[in-house]
Amino acid sequence: MKNIVLTGFMATGKTTVGKKVATNMSFGFIDTDKMIEKMANMTVSDIFEKYGEDYFRRLEKAAVIKAARLKNFVIATGGGVVLNPSNIVQLRKNGVVICFVARPEIILRNIGKNKDRPLLMVDNPEEKIRQLLKEREPFYRFADYTIDVSDMTIDEVAEEVIKAYIRLKKG
């Protein structure tokens, strides 16, 4: 069966929902950011700090190629995976791409005090979120299905993902 690929902005619940969906569907689960951390033997934040975003995006592309070869998996991607169109092409070969969106204030609340968000290490994180969302919005349109998770529970989002997947894998 095709993979379920979860994309969308950081802190929209891709990993949390992905694990739940994988359990409910008896699929494997993989997170591309965790794959990158394993490849580099350091955290995403440390990669950004030491080597910069370009290096991280190269590692991300390698992780996507590896993840896209899997079958019967839920793949949670990093928030910027959509910035490289070839990543989406790879993931779509054997996957249904579902994008999570949320209002900026919800994203900021979800991030809370988490300091592991290198792109948000700025004076005004909410403004940075708005800017990044605006920049990435055209890329998010390439998803097969989009879910606004702003006012949904984890269980509701997981249920919506499964329903969308069942509908879309037929097409």
Curated annotation (Swiss-Prot):
GO terms for cellular component: cytosol. Keywords: Amino-acid biosynthesis, Aromatic amino acid biosynthesis, ATP-binding, Cytoplasm, Kinase, Magnesium, Metal-binding, Nucleotide-binding, Transferase. Its cofactor is Mg(2+). Its EC number is 2.7.1.71. Pathway: Metabolic intermediate biosynthesis; chorismate biosynthesis; chorismate from D-erythrose 4-phosphate and phosphoenolpyruvate: step 5/7. Substrate binds at D33, R57, G79, R136. GO terms for molecular function: ATP binding; magnesium ion binding; shikimate kinase activity. Mg(2+) binds at T15. Catalyzes the specific phosphorylation of the 3-hydroxyl group of shikimic acid using ATP as a cosubstrate. Belongs to the shikimate kinase family. One of its GO terms (biological process) is chorismate biosynthetic process. NCBIfam families: PRK13947.1 (NF010553). This is Shikimate kinase. CDD domains: SK. The keyword Nucleotide-binding applies. It comes from the Bacteria. Binds 1 Mg(2+) ion per subunit. It catalyses: shikimate + ATP = 3-phosphoshikimate + ADP + H(+). It is found in: Cytoplasm. InterPro entries: P-loop_NTPase, Shikimate/glucono_kinase, Shikimate_kinase/TSH1, Shikimate_kinase_CS. ATP binds at A11, T12, G13, K14, T15, T16, R117. It is an enzyme of class 2 (transferase).
